[in-house]
């Protein structure tokens, strides 16, 4: 079964991408994007850069769960920012 790499990039704004996994080792994940671009991810770099990632079988339910979980995380971050701004006003 085909596996998918889900990556949440934290580059100033919330963005999640998915990649088809072609080869996975202990240290790297070789992928191909939807547009055909090949990419190699080093797992240590993903962890070091605080990027969330999971590798799962290509399953629509898993994909939806991942995106919903990350949307919740995004909302929690926004709520924290609003609460911080309210504290600063007081």
Language model feature labels by segment:
Residues 1-13:
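Short coil-to-beta transition motif at edge beta-strands of beta-rich domains
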């Amino acid at each position: 079964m085909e596996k998918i790499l889900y990556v949440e990039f934290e580059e100033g704004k919330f963005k999640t991408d998915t990649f088809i996994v072609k080869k996975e080792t202990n240290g790297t994940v070789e992928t191909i994007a939807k547009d055909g671009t090949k990419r190699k991810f080093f797992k240590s770099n993903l962890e070091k850069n605080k990027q969330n990632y999971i590798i799962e079988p290509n399953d629509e339910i898993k994909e939806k769960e991942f995106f919903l979980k990350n949307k919740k995380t995004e909302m929690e971050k926004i709520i924290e920012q609003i609460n911080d701004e309210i504290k600063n006003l007081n």
